[in-house]
Amino acid sequence: MTTTPAPTRADWVDARLRAEILEGTLAPGARLVVGDLAERYGVSPTPLREALRRLAAEGLVDWQPQRGARVATATRRDAEDLYELRLALEPVALGQSIVTAAGDPAYADAVRAAYDAFCAAGPGLADVLEAHHGFHAALMARCPNRPMVTAIERYAQQSVRFQMLATAGRSGRRDLDAEHRALLDAAVRGRADDAVRVLTEHLRASLAELRARAD
């Protein structure tokens, strides 16, 4: 029986910093002073530095040992570029995942569980968006192209952050619940073409919202 390792102090600090960055409490460009943050969170500098290294690897923090750390800046152009990358990769990964998992009830169960967790997430927006990412990750989990999945995971946290921009500009005309239910339904029924179409439309709509904010 495999047990899940207990969270470390670095894990706890990582989660706190991540949430504050994603929710905008720590603004783009804000300095992240190890001593100040360690005192604020009641931890030693060691787990703080480890958390900063992790966040830097994900692109959420700009960190250099001799120059200190700052919250990474995020331009609208960066967000648009990332959504274009998602459009190129994620529909392909989703289609391959569903075809590979055809007839396997464990895949359907995992996707349903991730969807239920997404629906129950909150109250913070960062928690909701993290669960949203978890749902999308479950959908693509059976993709046999592991380099593609690795690339998608590499930009996942930046994508969560940029979703804040799309959420802030949302007009209310989109029925996101319906979009995600359609993704769930297509995936668990093994309808790869339908799922790819829904995801493509979903990503294009989010990209359009980002571009609309620039007008």
Language model feature labels by segment:
Residues 57-62, 155-157, 172-174:
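Mobile beta-alpha loop/short-helix "lid" or hinge segments that flank ligand
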Residues 1-99, 207, 211-215:
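Short linear motifs at protein or domain termini
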Residues 66, 89, 113, 175-178:
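Alpha-helix N-cap/N′ positions at the starts of helices
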Residues 103-165, 177-185, 194-204:
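Conserved amphipathic alpha-helical segments that form helical-bundle/coiled-coil interaction surfaces
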Residues 12, 36, 78, 127, ...:
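An acidic, carboxylate-rich microenvironment
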